[in-house]
Curated annotation (Swiss-Prot):
GO terms for molecular function: protoheme IX farnesyltransferase activity. PROSITE patterns: UBIA (PS00943). It comes from Pyrobaculum islandicum (strain DSM 4184 / JCM 9189 / GEO3). This is Protoheme IX farnesyltransferase. Carbon 2 of the heme B porphyrin ring is defined according to the Fischer nomenclature. Coiled coil: none annotated. Its main location: membrane.
Length: 278
């Protein structure tokens, strides 16, 4: 894959772009395809730009961790200055176009999403506190709320409640992955939760958070969803997440934690698709 594409973190940002799209479709009475295409383009630029900036800012961390050492910057595939200019150009284009093409309120959420990931998470918190992902997680809320605001023209309580499904899922997902690579994070000096506390405590916290996230998603769909097919999708994701989280609590092993990570990964996607079916 082209290293400039890798900088965008396509395997990560597609879910945030999907949350914007789902927010719009869920809120809009009818889908305006020109608005939807503009939303996808703007989200790709802004979210991809923030991801590329994260690559640039964390290039020393990536070089110190075996999982990330082959990324474009530590591997020397792209000059550092080029990566910085590329990330800022994409970000500026995405934020500017969001106000022009989508309007002030969706544009505000696009800008806030970029700010929470690129500044709050990447610059301010990542290297300083285990709360980093809790601060940066609001970028996930912003993606859904931006799409919702485009579809409805405003943001209401249901939109905020639904957006917190993303917020709760992010730390449970990231910390489960960080548990597997906790030694890498310690070596790099990054205070991710599983790298700084007792391993058994990490398992308990992450597993309970996964269960709480799954239960919250199920409640949201029962409250705001309208499709039996959607409910079936959500229930499948919830069942897999809860079952593997209970297994992790019982075994407290690396194998069980990885099973939980893999099983809980699809639940947010299933929930978002279920909202579309509604």
């Amino acid at each position: 894959m082209n290293p400039y594409i890798v900088l965008l973190k396509p395997r990560v940002i597609w879910l945030l772009i999907l949350s914007s799209v789902v927010g719009y479709i869920y809120a809009a009475q009818t889908v305006d395809w020109s608005k939807l295409i503009a939303l996808i383009a703007v989200a790709t630029l802004a979210v991809g730009g923030s991801a590329a900036f994260n690559h640039y800012w964390e290039r020393d961390i990536d070089a110190a961790m075996s999982r990330t050492a082959r990324r474009p910057l530590p591997a020397g595939l792209i000059p550092e200055f080029n990566a910085l200019v590329y990330s800022l150009a994409l970000s500026a284009a995405g934020i500017t176009l969001s106000f022009y093409l989508l309007g002030p309120l969706p544009g505000l959420f696009v800008a806030l999403g970029w700010f929470f990931y690129a500044v709050v998470y990447t610059i301010w918190l990542k290297r300083k506190t285990w709360l980093n992902i809790l601060g940066g997680g609001f970028a996930g809320n912003a993606t859904f709320l931006g799409g919702y605001a485009l579809g409805k023209g405003t943001v209401d309580l249901p939109a905020v409640l639904i957006s917190f499904a993303i917020y709760l899922w992010i730390p449970s997902h990231i910390w489960a992955l960080a548990y597997k690579y906790r030694h890498d994070y310690r070596k790099a000096g990054v205070p991710m939760l599983p790298a700084i506390i007792d391993e058994k405590k990490s398992v308990v916290i992450i597993s309970i958070l996964n269960i709480a996230s799954a239960v919250y998603i199920l409640w949201l769909y029962l409250a705001f969803g309208q499709s039996l097919l959607g409910l079936a999708l959500v229930f499948a994701g919830v069942a897999g997440t809860v079952a593997t989280s209970i297994l992790a609590l019982k075994e407290k092993s690396d194998r069980a934690m990885w099973k939980m990570y893999k099983a809980s990964s699809p639940i947010l996607t299933l929930f978002l698709l279920a909202l579309v079916f509604s």
